Amino acid sequence: MSPVQPLAGRQAADDPLIRLQEVAVTFGGRSILQDVRLEVVPGRITTLVGNNGAGKTTLLRVVVGLTHTAAGRVWRAPQVRIGYVPQHFSVDANLPITARRFMALSGRANAARWQEVVADTGVEELLDQPLQGLSGGEMRRILLARALLQHPSVLALDEPAAGLDGRSQGALYRLIGTLRQRYGCAVVIISHDLNLVMAASDEVLCLEHGRIACRGAPASVIEHPEYQKLFGSHLGPDTGVFPHDHHDHSGPALAGGGRG
């Protein structure tokens, strides 16, 4: 098991909060991740894409600290705080609880922070509803708000738009972009919606069989042969979710061994 080590020295604003170097993960003798390098940087949205079984969720769980590594190194900045929103969240039907009470269980927020997060995530009208009655999109907003109440420096989101219609997906990604700018946190996302990935991300990592096949700015990754082999070059119609100049997508896509 590879130990987690603190990042040494004083942190600059653009220094990585988490760094993975040559990380490998195995389950039952089977290789899940191999030679993965990643830097989680404040203010950057990094999106993990790949087919089912490529290792995306395992990599996100390594970032969060829920999965141990078999090789490589994981560094974390002192006092790094991670807000994790899993893809699946089940509510015990025998334990009725309102969204307000569920959010309050985070235990970190003062009144000012509570009001700020509730306003930013638009969950005011949901607070007194039982969790069991919330839709998938509403539940994800509550989970995101609860994560933000914990003052995270890193937000880790596993398929946050899964099961949502196009309008709800667009609204959620706009919200994530706004929160990144407002709170300055790093964001690591798993997504299968390639239109939104290209519009919302600063960096895209494309995984295949547990390795990073290519990485870089979205517009350059889509031209990379490894990406096109997996997904083709066509993204489908423009969603109109973000303006085309939302990010500067210039710069080369790197092969998997490049710097994270």
From Swiss-Prot:
Region (Disordered) residue spans: 241-260
Kindly give the InterPro entries that the UniProt entry links to this protein: AAA+_ATPase, ABC_transporter-like_ATP-bd, ABC_transporter-like_CS, Metal_Ion_Import_ABC, P-loop_NTPase
Q: What reaction(s) does this enzyme catalyze?
A: Zn(2+)(out) + ATP(in) + H2O(in) = Zn(2+)(in) + ADP(in) + phosphate(in) + H(+)(in)
Q: A Gene Ontology molecular-function term?
A: ATP binding
What is said about its interaction partners and assembly? The complex is composed of two ATP-binding proteins (ZnuC), two transmembrane proteins (ZnuB) and a solute-binding protein (ZnuA).
Q: Where is this protein found?
A: Cell inner membrane
Q: Which Pfam families match?
A: ABC_tran
Which keywords describe this protein according to UniProt?
ATP-binding, Cell inner membrane, Cell membrane, Ion transport, Membrane, Nucleotide-binding, Translocase, Transport, Zinc, Zinc transport
Q: Which organism is it from?
A: Halorhodospira halophila (strain DSM 244 / SL1) (Ectothiorhodospira halophila (strain DSM 244 / SL1))
Q: Which GO terms describe its cellular component?
A: plasma membrane
What this chain does, per the record? Answer: Part of the ABC transporter complex ZnuABC involved in zinc import. Responsible for energy coupling to the transport system.
The lineage, from the top, is:
Bacteria, Pseudomonadati, Pseudomonadota, Gammaproteobacteria, Chromatiales
Q: Which residue intervals define the domain ABC transporter in the entry?
A: 18-234
Indicate what this protein is called per its UniProt record. Zinc import ATP-binding protein ZnuC
Q: How does it sit in the membrane?
A: Peripheral membrane protein
Which EC class heads this enzyme's classification? translocase
Q: Give the UniProt family note.
A: Belongs to the ABC transporter superfamily. Zinc importer (TC 3.A.1.15.5) family.
EC number of this enzyme: 7.2.2.20
The GO biological-process annotations, alphabetized, read as: response to zinc ion
Positions with a binding annotation for ATP: 50-57
* Superkingdom of the source species: Bacteria
Supply the PANTHER family for this chain: METAL TRANSPORT SYSTEM ATP-BINDING PROTEIN TM_0124-RELATED, ZINC IMPORT ATP-BINDING PROTEIN ZNUC
